[in-house]
Each structure stands twice: as structure tokens, then as C-alpha cells.
Amino acid sequence: MEEEEHEVYGGEIPEVGDTDVPDPDIDMSAADEDAVTELAEMKRRLKEMEEEAAALREMQAKVEKEMGATQDPASMAANQEGKEEVDARSVYVGNVDYACTPEEVQLHFQTCGTVNRVTILMDKFGQPKGFAYVEFVEVEAVQEALQLNESELHGRQLKVSPKRTNVPGMKQYHPGRFNPSMGYRFRRPFVPPYFYSPYGYGKAPRFRRPMRYMPYQ
């Protein structure tokens, strides 16, 4: 019986000095320094992100506070009172010439009192609407300005009246008043329009019954 040969190792047997063994004399401080530097950079970026988030929260809180202040009923009431006080010292001027300037309107009303502001309303295209508001410093100047109603400026008669304060959320409604000199106008009842009928006036159309099919017998 023949003996079988088994190959245990096909290469050369390495010597003891050829194996890779970590050298204990190698300095690992360089790798540690890189890790420490990277960790410090990550901490710095994280701190910057936290600071940005805090700034955004502070800005949002400030905006919400300002929005809440605008919706405060007390502040709205104060603003409304201030507007009413300004309107009490102002007049509405209608039928103003389109070529008229605020300076000319001021000169026209300066004999009534101290003019604080002249506002000529414009449309969305920047063209004058034909009326203006004149605000005085003194409340008594309003009565003097009303005396200039139907006075002429640029050849046109001005319509001067006290300025009315618009209440937010309310629409002004001016119902017609009964005038004894003009009489009361009744509304006429609705009368349907006359409808032309080809069958003649007052005659209803006559419809024939549909013919039934009768088969031959």
C-alpha cells in the first residue's frame, strides 16, 4: 500500500524577524492631534448653529410681539381717537382742478388759519382724483374754511365740507330722507312686459293631441 503525500506548506517558511509587529517606538501623538482638532471644529460649528437658531427665535418673538401690539384693542382705540382728533381739524375739498397743486390749495385756505397739511388724493396711475383734504392746526379754522364753500380756484367752484371719520369695519349708509317740498315717491308695482303672442291677444295656444299610430286591419 502506497503512502499518500500531503503538502503542508507550499512556500518558504518565514523567519522570525520578517513578521509585521507594531513598533512600540512609533509616535501616535500626530493622529491624536488630528482627532482633537476635528472634534474642536465640530464643536465650533455646533455652537454657531445654536447661536443662529437662538437669533431666529428672538427675531420671531419680536415680530410676534409687534403683530400683537398692532392688534391690541387699546392701541387701536388710541389710534382711532387720534384720527378723530385730526379729522376734527380738517375739511374735505371737492371739485379741485386736476392741475391744482397742494401749494395753491394752501394759499387758498391760509386766511382761515394755519394750514398743517394738504393732501390731494391720487389714483393708481398717479393722476389726481379731483378732491383734497386740508388739515389745520386750530379747530376753529374749520368753520372759517366752510365759508369758502363754492369759492373759485382755477375757475372751478370748490365744495368744502367737514371731513368725516371712517370707523373701521363699518360702512356708512345714508338713507334717503323725506322731503315735504318734493313729496314722497312711491315705488310703482312691477308690471311684466307685454308679451306678443302669435295666437292673438288674450288667446291661449291650442295644442293638438299627438296622432296615434293605427295599423291597417
Curated annotation (Swiss-Prot):
Chain positions covered by the region annotation Disordered: 1-28
Superkingdom assignment: Eukaryota
Motif placement: Nuclear localization signal: 162-169
Cysteine pairs bridged by disulfides in the record: none
Alphabetized CDD domains for the sequence: RRM_II_PABPs (cd12306)
Family matches, as SMART domains: RRM (SM00360)
Protein's recorded name: Polyadenylate-binding protein 3
Native source species: Arabidopsis thaliana (Mouse-ear cress)
Taxonomic placement: Eukaryota, Viridiplantae, Streptophyta, Embryophyta, Tracheophyta
